[in-house]
């Protein structure tokens, strides 16, 4: 019986910790507007001017390809860059969790 109580308590603690660690999409939208919108557009669809000027393809952030990425994969791209996308060093910690949460809202 004591083992069952410990298991239930541990499960509750981990589920609250996971919910607390998740980003806030509303706060993430503000981060996105500041750090991502110029290239990725207001709705996650690439800015055509940037695509033409940089001669790049920018994935639709609401696409299945992006949405199937893990949060850690998205964070790695934001903080480390990929291809012609530079690393965004100003987005860290909670802001990084928040922007990932916002990107999840762009799912098509």
Please report, for each region that a protein language model flagged, where it lies by residue.
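Periplasmic/extracellular electron-transfer cofactor-ligation site
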Residues: 23-56, 80-89, 105-108
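Post-cleavage N-terminal segment of exported redox proteins
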Residues: 1-24, 73, 77, 102-108
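Serine/threonine-rich low-complexity intrinsically disordered regions
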Residues: 3-5, 27-30, 47, 62-65, ...
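Extracytoplasmic electron-transfer domains, predominantly the class I c-type cytochrome c fold
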Residues: 53-107
């Amino acid at each position: 019986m004591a083992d069952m109580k410990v298991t239930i308590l541990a499960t509750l603690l981990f589920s609250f910790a996971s919910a607390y660690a998740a980003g806030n999409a509303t706060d993430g939208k503000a981060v996105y507007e500041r750090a991502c919108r110029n290239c990725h557009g207001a709705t996650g669809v690439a800015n055509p001017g940037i695509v033409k000027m940089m001669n790049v393809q920018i994935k639709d952030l609401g696409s299945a390809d992006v949405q199937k990425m893990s949060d850690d994969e998205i964070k790695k791209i934001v903080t480390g860059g990929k291809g012609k996308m530079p690393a965004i060093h100003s987005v860290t910690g909670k802001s990084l969790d928040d922007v990932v949460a916002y990107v999840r809202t762009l799912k098509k």
